[in-house]
Curated annotation (Swiss-Prot):
Matching InterPro entries: Enolpyruvate_Tfrase_dom (IPR001986), Enolpyruvate_Tfrase_sf (IPR036968), MurA_subfamily (IPR050068), RNA3'P_cycl/enolpyr_Trfase_a/b (IPR013792), UDP_GlcNAc_COvinyl_MurA (IPR005750)
Modified residues (2-(S-cysteinyl)pyruvic acid O-phosphothioketal): 115
Active site: 115 (proton donor)
UniProt enzyme class: transferase
Keywords for this protein: Cell cycle, Cell division, Cell shape, Cell wall biogenesis/degradation, Cytoplasm, Peptidoglycan synthesis, Pyruvate, Transferase
Designated gene of the protein: murA
Family statement: Belongs to the EPSP synthase family. MurA subfamily.
Biological-process GO terms, alphabetical: cell division; cell wall organization; peptidoglycan biosynthetic process; regulation of cell shape; UDP-N-acetylgalactosamine biosynthetic process
GO cellular component: cytoplasm
Protein name: UDP-N-acetylglucosamine 1-carboxyvinyltransferase
Role according to the record: Cell wall formation. Adds enolpyruvyl to UDP-N-acetylglucosamine.
Record localization: Cytoplasm
Source organism: Proteus mirabilis (strain HI4320)
Length: 420
């Protein structure tokens, strides 16, 4: 199993080019199942989860080629089951179900895996598909969906805000008969990006990015070319990297308007931030960040996927800051690892109180999930001595070539292969 060896402390400074958004690329790849003509996707990140999705699409009979762009040809799908061996590492595979049942009248997906951060039930996905007329059964670890004829448009009020279920319902409703309205929909930029992609193919979706999405069902989708939006979480991670190391970074191929809550907290922490149409710069002018208090919330609130990085910021900041996690349970697994490096923190239920320390010390730590692993790597960059980050397969699921990008900012980081 690969590890990172990081030598610190380092002041991280320079430019970094942001990759396409994993959380948009995944639903868009699955939504391409709906297309009856070939699709070309650009700015698709090179990640483990993307590779797994491509394998899964190929298993279904979709022809997928990666040659700079990703080309998806779903004209000859002949298999309607996403099997356990491909699904077990990635919860996003549930997004195959809506497009399969919408276009072909049937589909089945093994109950998904992914990060070990609390309960992520598929109930909301199932309820939404049932409201569109699908018959759902759970059998031997598989979610199976069927419908005779086309799905039927419906007025769906979601019990709670869910990014995943919003995407499932939206992609299924595109080919449904009549109009679907999703109330209490998630508002994340990646949902808007998925809707924009589908509209490029001929869908009629309006309101994506708000809490009320309207889908006028169409009979078929064609092909087209679409560029995935930049990854706001990767952008935020590199901004925090500069903030905790008292450095300066310019993020290119970024989308500042997807990061309002994060940029506000970084400014509160003392960062000097400037933005352009497709770039963000952060400069700490050599100063230590100030601790901030924040609460995660659905978009446009503070993103849960930036919580671990801001935990690190607070743990090396001037003062004390409180972080409350409202989206997922069990998402402070990075805190005990950071305490091994000399951090001072107390966890009480879904809140962590962070007391800033002057310095961290290198240690052997273990990544537990995708974003937690990023915070441990950044901690290694600023800690005195050597840090070994174990189980970095988590980080490869969500960050493209992170060690090369950090090296470009001056980090002393290397990947140790399991046979090294």
């Amino acid at each position: 199993m690969d590890k990172f060896r990081v030598q610190g402390p380092t002041c991280l400074s320079g430019e970094v080019t942001i990759s396409g958004a994993k959380n948009a690329a995944l639903p868009i790849l699955f939504a391409a199942i709906l297309a009856e003509e070939p699709v070309e996707l650009t700015n698709v990140p090179k990640l483990k989860d993307i590779d797994t999705t491509i394998k899964l699409l190929n298993r279904l009979g979709t022809k997928v080629e990666r040659n700079g762009s990703v080309f998806v040809d779903a004209r000859h799908i002949n298999e309607f089951c996403a099997p356990y061996e491909l699904v077990k590492t990635m919860r996003a595979s549930i997004w195959a179900l809506g497009p399969l049942v919408a276009r072909f009248g049937r589909g089945q997906v093994s109950l998904p895996g992914g990060c070990a951060i609390g309960a992520r039930p598929v109930d909301l996905h199932i309820t939404g598909l049932e409201q569109l007329g699908a018959e759902i059964t759970l059998d031997e670890g598989y979610v199976k969906a069927r419908v005779d004829g086309r799905l039927k448009g419906a007025h769906i009020v979601m019990d709670k805000v869910s990014v995943g279920a919003t995407i499932t319902i939206m992609t299924a409703a595109v080919l449904a008969e009549g109009k679907t309205i999703i109330e209490n929909a998630a508002r994340e930029p990646e949902i808007e990006d998925t809707a924009n992609f589908l509209n490029t193919l001929g869908a009629k979706i309006s309101g994506a990015g708000t809490d009320s999405i309207t889908i006028e069902g169409v009979e078929r989708l064609g092909g087209g070319t679409y560029q995935i939006l930049p990854d706001r979480i990767e952008t935020g991670t590199f901004l925090v990297a500069a903030a905790v190391s008292r450095g300066r970074v310019v993020c290119r191929n970024a989308k500042p308007d997807t990061l309002d809550a994060v940029l506000a907290k970084l400014r509160e922490a003392g960062a000097d931030i400037e933005t352009g149409e497709d770039w963000i710069s952060l400069d700490m002018h050599g100063k230590r960040p100030k601790a901030v208090t924040l609460r995660t919330a659905p978009h446009p609130g503070f993103p849960t996927d930036m919580q671990a990085q801001f935990s690190l910021l607070n743990l090396v900041a001037d003062g004390a800051g409180m972080i409350t996690e409202t989206i997922f349970e069990n998402r402070f697994m990075h805190i005990p690892e950071l305490i091994r490096m000399g951090a001072h923190a107390e966890i009480e239920s879904n809140t962590v109180l962070c007391h800033g320390v002057d310095k961290l010390s290198g240690a052997q730590v273990m990544a537990t999930d995708l974003r937690a692993s990023a915070s441990l790597v950044l901690a290694g960059c600023i800690a005195e001595g050597t840090t070994i980050v174990d189980r970095i397969y988590h980080i490869d699921r969500g960050y493209e070539n992170i060690e090369a990008k950090l090296q470009g900012l001056g980090a002393k980081i290397e990947r140790l292969h399991s046979n090294d």
